[in-house]
């Protein structure tokens, strides 16, 4: 269940995040040594790269000198927005970028990760091409995935060490990951929990109420926001992150996700799967700062739920 703040509103608004991570100087030090103490695990080459990219400021002045003499009372600021104005793509929006991570909003129809059969029309490939503008050997590292048909927020790492930190500590680092969906029919309950064992057979994920020795335990918490026009608008909170988990659990409840032909939906009024990852909150893998990202519900979702 989410450890972040619960959203009581059915219409969340995008939240802005501070532009800088700020460290207060309490004793004399050189900038390089100061940053290596404050940013656990960072290398000297990484600090030099940050300086070269002109994203480090001392008392609001960009500083590129690694041995800059800091004095008590000064503030060191690290910009958390790097060149995202240069990024434009019809299927992918760059929400946040710093030296370690990228947060993006993916449109439905785009694969998260490159595959043997599809290498270019993927979020991973698009972002690889973007980061190579800074250095030809740069690339992004996969941390988690969204189904091709699902839209919403997701995160990539910019180096292997950050990727490993995120993957190995995912359940401790991520405090809130929430989805919104439109499902068929009127939900019987305002809120509840679905638990089952999910078995992945590649083309289809099977759900079982008991452990058959092959499945992985999955837990989905849901809250019904609105019922209208034979549909229900539902917020979903994942306690586990299994393949197709939400889609299978909504089918288990007898209310398949609208547009999901694979898992029981008989209607497709939006021409897409009605599932969107609208909230992602986590502790930054390096600075340990709490990061909160939230997008509005898709406009098409709101239109379908307007009472006629």
List each model region and its residues.
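Short, surface-exposed loop/helix-turn segments at secondary-structure junctions
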Residues: 209-210, 258-267
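The conserved catalytic core of RNA pseudouridine synthases
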Residues: 136-168, 176, 195-196, 200-253, ...
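Conserved hydrophobic positions within beta-strands
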Residues: 94, 183, 221-224, 257
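RNA pseudouridine synthases
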Residues: 1-193, 197-202, 300-304
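Edge beta-strands of extracellular beta-sandwich domains
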Residues: 89-91, 257-260
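Active-site-adjacent capping/gating segments
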Residues: 269-277
């Amino acid at each position: 269940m989410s450890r972040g703040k619960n959203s009581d509103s059915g219409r969340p608004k995008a939240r802005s995040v501070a532009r800088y991570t700020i460290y207060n100087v309490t004793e004399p030090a050189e900038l390089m040594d100061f940053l290596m103490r404050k940013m656990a695990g960072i290398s000297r080459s990484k600090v030099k790269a940050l300086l070269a990219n002109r994203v480090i400021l001392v008392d609001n002045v960009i500083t590129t000198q690694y041995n800059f003499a800091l004095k008590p009372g000064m503030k060191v600021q690290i910009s958390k927005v790097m060149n995202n104005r240069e990024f434009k793509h019809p299927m992918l929006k760059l929400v946040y970028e710093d030296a370690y991570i990228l947060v993006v909003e993916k449109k439905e129809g785009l694969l998260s990760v490159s595959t043997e059969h599809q290498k270019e029309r993927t979020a991973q490939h698009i972002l690889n091409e973007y980061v190579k503008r800074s250095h030809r050997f740069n690339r992004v590292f996969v941390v988690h995935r969204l189904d091709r048909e699902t839209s919403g927020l997701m995160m990539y790492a910019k180096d292997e060490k950050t990727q490993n930190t995120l993957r190995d500590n995912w359940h401790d680092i991520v405090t809130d990951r929430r989805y919104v969906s439109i499902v068929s029919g009127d939900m019987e309950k305002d809120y509840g929990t679905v638990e089952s064992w999910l078995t992945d057979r590649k083309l289809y994920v099977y759900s079982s109420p008991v452990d058959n020795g092959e499945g992985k335990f999955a837990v989905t918490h849901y809250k019904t926001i609105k019922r209208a026009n034979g549909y229900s608008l539902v917020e979903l909170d994942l306690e586990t992150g299994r393949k197709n988990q939400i889609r299978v659990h909504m089918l288990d409840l007898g209310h398949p996700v609208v547009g999901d032909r694979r898992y029981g939906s008989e209607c497709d009024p939006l021409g897409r799967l009605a599932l969107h990852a609208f909230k992602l909150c986590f502790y930054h893998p390096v600075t340990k700062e709490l990061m909160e990202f939230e997008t509005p519900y898709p406009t098409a979702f709101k239109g379908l739920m307007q009472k006629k």
